[in-house]
Structures are given as C-alpha cells and as structure tokens.
Amino acid sequence: MADGQMPFSCHYPSRLRRDPFRDSPLSSRLLDDGFGMDPFPDDLTASWPDWALPRLSSAWPGTLRSGMVPRGPTATARFGVPAEGRTPPPFPGEPWKVCVNVHSFKPEELMVKTKDGYVEVSGKHEEKQQEGGIVSKNFTKKIQLPAEVDPVTVFASLSPEGLLIIEAPQVPPYSTFGESSFNNELPQDSQEVTCT
C-alpha cells in the first residue's frame, strides 16, 4: 500500500486505518456508560444547592455519539437550544423571561413587538463612517411565545450592560363555570356587610 492512499502519512505497512468510534464493537457503548455509579456520590453532594443536585445527578437523556445531538424535552435544559425551535415553557408561577444581547445598540434604535405568537426584536444602526468605510448594522430576532403567556402582557427593559430583558407573566389557568374547584358561598365569618 502506498503512502498516498492512506489518510495519514505513516511508514508502517502493518498499520491499518481505523476509527475507534466506528470500528470497535464497544463503540456503541463508549459514551453511554455510567459505569454503574451516580455522577456524584452521596458524601460529595452535601454542599450542593438543592436546585442543582437533581439536575447534576440525573441520568443522561439518551445516547450521544459522534455527529448526533439529543432531541427531546430535556435537550433545551441541557444544551440551551429549545427543541423544535420553541422557547422553554416557564415553571408554574414564574414569569416567562428571555434575554437578548443588544449592547451595541442604543435604546432608540431597538424595537420590540408581538405578532402571531412571536416576540420580534429588531435593531438598526444608521449608516456611520468608520475606519475608511460606511458601517450599518441591523438584526431581527423572533422568539416564539409559550402557550402559557398572553402576548398583550409582554414587556421589555434594557439593562445597563446592554441586555434586553423580555418578560411576561403566565396566564392563570381558567376554570369553567360550575367547576367544583371553588365554592360559590361566602364563609360564615366573612367581613362583608350587606348595605341596605
């Protein structure tokens, strides 16, 4: 075999080209193994905050092999990229919140609007003469609103660091008329008095 036919120049004819991630019979389990142990033993977890421990000690959602990206509801939490292009749903009672870095734009150059279930953030610099040329910057970012958020309640604020913070409270769950989740009668020790 000539050196020109091998992907790497190696002068040992007994060496064969191999990919350890594809050729080995164990390659399918190479990155899947938990080795029968939790990621963190119990004695090391005493100092971890309560919110971090379940996230760090939970099992990996699926296999991750070269060239593969996990898809599913946990992909958002683990990789910061929402599955199916949606923003993550807020936790019950917490407002929906998204931050957009707009540090190179002035407040008067930014526009935030809601349309068809999306928040659209856009910014545009006027043309400026810089370093022997004309520079113009503009961007548009669309963020899909979760179903739990009313588009009318969306508001935005700009931090001193140049982060545009877009927030909206969750819509409270509606109950249908006649549902037994609430009582129509006033309690006997009520402070209300009927006026005559």
Swiss-Prot record:
Disease per UniProt entry? Neuronopathy, distal hereditary motor, autosomal dominant 2: A form of distal hereditary motor neuronopathy, a heterogeneous group of neuromuscular disorders caused by selective degeneration of motor neurons in the anterior horn of the spinal cord, without sensory deficit in the posterior horn. The overall clinical picture consists of a classical distal muscular atrophy syndrome in the legs without clinical sensory loss. The disease starts with weakness and wasting of distal muscles of the anterior tibial and peroneal compartments of the legs.
InterPro entries named among the record's database cross-references = A-crystallin/Hsp20_dom, Alpha-crystallin/sHSP_animal, HSP20-like_chaperone, HSPB8, HspB8_ACD
Which keywords belong to this entry?
Answer: Chaperone, Charcot-Marie-Tooth disease, Cytoplasm, Disease variant, Methylation, Myofibrillar myopathy, Neurodegeneration, Neuropathy, Nucleus, Phosphoprotein, Stress response
- Name of the protein in its database record: Heat shock protein beta-8
Under the subunit heading, UniProt states: Monomer. Forms a ternary complex with BAG3 and HSPA1A. Component of the chaperone-assisted selective autophagy (CASA) complex consisting of BAG3, HSPA8/HSC70, HSPB8 and STUB1/CHIP. Interacts with HSPB1. Interacts with DNAJB6. Interacts with BAG3.
Q: List the disulfide bonds.
A: none
* Molecular functions per Gene Ontology: identical protein binding; protein homodimerization activity
Q: Does the keyword Cell cycle apply?
A: no
Q: Which stretches are tagged as biased composition: Polar residues?
A: 177-196
Q: What is the effect of changing residue 141 to M?
A: In HMND2; likely pathogenic; increased interaction with BAG3; no effect on cytoskeleton architecture; no effect on cytoplasmic location
User: What does UniProt list as this organism's lineage?
Assistant: Eukaryota, Metazoa, Chordata, Craniata, Vertebrata
Keyword ATP-binding applies: no
The organism is Homo sapiens (Human)
Say what the protein does. Answer: Involved in the chaperone-assisted selective autophagy (CASA), a crucial process for protein quality control, particularly in mechanical strained cells and tissues such as muscle. Displays temperature-dependent chaperone activity.
